Amino acid sequence: MSHKILLVNGPNLNLLGRREPSVYGHQTLADIVAELKQQAKLAEVELEHIQSNAEFELINAIHATDAQMIIINPAAFTHTSVALRDALLGVAIPFFEVHLSNVHAREAFRHHSYFSDKAIGVICGFGSQGYEFALAAAIKRLNQPQ
């Protein structure tokens, strides 16, 4: 496999399937990641995954990766984490931002993202399918001639 994509999931996403299923859906994060790994394998792309409720662990994973692309759902860190934004900018790896819910249709404090202005694209409101869209876009971008 010639390409690698890092999938980063932020706080509370380990509770998918149990936490507010009317907002976030019934699939678990393990189910979503398994489907994405299969999608990546079919495209001959390696998908590395990290989920953490600890900001520093996400930052360390971003610093350590040798991936050519990142897909990130920063979750609640979307609205608060300059440090996570700086980690992404520091490694200069292109990234897509994903959110399960439509953050713009929710509480006002969720409307601001520290990542959107630097992301290749933002996908929100499509539930777990948003990850599939982001992965397809990342794979397509990686396979484009330089």
Swiss-Prot record:
The gene is aroQ. One of its GO terms (biological process) is amino acid biosynthetic process. HAMAP family: AroQ (MF_00169). It is an enzyme of class 4 (lyase). It comes from Shewanella baltica (strain OS155 / ATCC BAA-1091). GO terms for molecular function: 3-dehydroquinate dehydratase activity. The active site is at 24 (proton acceptor), 99 (proton donor). The record marks 19 as: Transition state stabilizer. This is 3-dehydroquinate dehydratase. Substrate binds at residues 73, 79, 86, 100-101, 110. Belongs to the type-II 3-dehydroquinase family. Pathway: Metabolic intermediate biosynthesis; chorismate biosynthesis; chorismate from D-erythrose 4-phosphate and phosphoenolpyruvate: step 3/7. Catalyzes a trans-dehydration via an enolate intermediate. It catalyses: 3-dehydroquinate = 3-dehydroshikimate + H2O. NCBIfam families: aroQ, PRK05395.1-1, PRK05395.1-2, PRK05395.1-3, PRK05395.1-4.
